[in-house]
C-alpha cells in the first residue's frame, strides 16, 4: 500500500462529443446516442472553415482525426453525423466533474475544460490501494455524470497525465517513477508530453 502523496489525472473521453451526446439525450429522451455511431462535434461547414473538434469512437475507425476539416471527414465517412459545439453545456459538465472530485479532495487543479488533477495526501491511510480507489472513482463518474474518463496515477502531475494517455477509453493506468523504464522507454518519442514535431524529429 502506498502511503505518500498521490496525484490522479482525470481526462474525459471524447469530452465535447460525450457532453453533446448527453445534452441531446437529456433534451430528446430515447434519441440516438451520438457516442454509438460515427459522429463529430464541428464548426461551421458552410464557411468551409469547420473542423472536427471531437469525434466518437466509431468515427475514429474511419480514420477521422481531431482538427481535420469537416469536408475531409465527410469524404471518409459520408454518413457522419455532425453537431455544433455548445460551450455552455461543456462548462456545466466540467463544473459537475470538478464538484464530484472535490468530494474526495480540495486539491483539484484544472488543466483544461475536460482535464484536471486531483491531489491526495497520505493516500494509503485515507483511501487504500490506488488502482482500486481510482476504479471506484471512474465508475462513480460514469454512473453519476453519465460519461467516461481515463485516470492516470503517479506521484507527480507529469507522470499522472502521461499515464492517463496510455490506452483509452474508460481505463485506469499507473506510471510511478519506478515503472518508467518498463512502461515508457519503449514507447515512440511522440508519446512524451509537450514534445512537438520539431523536438520529436531532433530526438529521433
Q: Language-model segments: which ranges?
A:
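Gly/Gly-Pro- and Ser/Thr-rich, intrinsically disordered tail segments characteristic of DNA damage-repair
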Residues: 1-204
Amino acid at each position: 500500500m502506498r502511503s505518500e502523496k498521490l496525484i490522479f489525472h482525470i481526462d474525459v473521453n471524447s469530452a465535447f462529443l460525450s457532453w453533446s451526446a448527453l445534452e441531446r439525450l437529456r433534451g430528446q429522451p430515447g434519441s440516438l446516442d451520438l457516442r454509438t455511431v460515427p459522429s463529430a462535434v464541428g464548426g461551421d461547414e458552410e464557411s468551409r472553415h469547420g473542423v472536427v473538434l471531437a469525434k466518437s469512437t466509431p468515427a475514429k475507425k474511419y480514420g477521422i482525426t481531431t482538427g481535420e476539416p469537416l469536408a475531409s471527414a465527410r469524404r471518409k465517412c459520408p454518413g457522419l453525423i455532425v453537431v455544433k459545439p455548445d460551450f455552455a453545456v461543456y462548462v456545466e459538465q466540467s463544473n459537475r466533474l470538478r464538484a464530484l472530485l472535490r468530494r474526495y479532495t480540495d486539491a483539484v487543479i484544472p488543466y483544461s475544460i475536460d482535464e484536471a488533477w486531483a491531489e491526495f495526501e497520505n493516500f494509503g491511510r485515507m483511501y487504500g490501494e490506488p488502482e482500486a480507489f481510482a476504479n471506484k472513482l471512474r465508475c462513480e463518474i460514469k454512473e453519476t455524470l453519465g460519461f467516461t474518463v481515463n485516470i492516470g496515477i503517479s506521484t507527480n502531475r507529469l507522470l499522472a497525465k502521461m499515464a492517463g494517455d496510455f490506452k483509452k477509453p474508460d481505463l485506469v493506468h499507473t506510471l510511478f517513477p519506478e515503472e518508467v523504464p518498463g512502461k515508457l522507454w519503449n514507447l515512440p518519442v511522440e508519446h512524451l508530453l509537450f514534445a512537438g514535431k520539431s523536438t520529436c524529429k531532433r530526438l529521433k
